[in-house]
Amino acid sequence: AGRAPAPPPEPPLSRERRRIKHILSQLGMAGEKGSQDIIELCIALLQRGQTASQVGVAALCAQLSDNPKTMEQRARRALDRGLNHIASLGVEDYTNEFFTRYSARLFPFQEVRAEMAHLQGKGPGGKANLRTFLDGLLILAEEE
């Protein structure tokens, strides 16, 4: 009686890719066009062992796309959607598990607060920082 053959090895970084997709879906970003760009940016950074702060988002987009400005803009739009979603969770219940887990790790606190205030009709919205978001997402993807 032989044992079942070992499952084939997973492609490199597939665990991290799944984790990133999961986080983006929790942030309400999975359906956005730019979410795939964010995943590509993260995988490229993981492969290089670098952060977005070290490389720069514009430089990384230029290496990955024939149209880097469009790639960066799609990612920023998806990120704005994520900031809006996390702020909505915070307005509803600031003890929400996803809000407490992701808000401070992926977005500057003052920007989340500004977006929450905006949702309540008190001032302009927050501005998400793609570099900060990518760096935080890399850490989260490697954690679990």
Where are these regions (language model features)?
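Charge-biased C-terminal accessory regions appended to nucleic-acid-, cytoskeletal NTPase
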Residues: 87, 91-144
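Charged/polar positions within long, soluble alpha-helices
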Residues: 50, 80-87, 117
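C-terminal output/effector regions of signal-responsive regulators
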Residues: 2-75, 83, 92, 123-127, ...
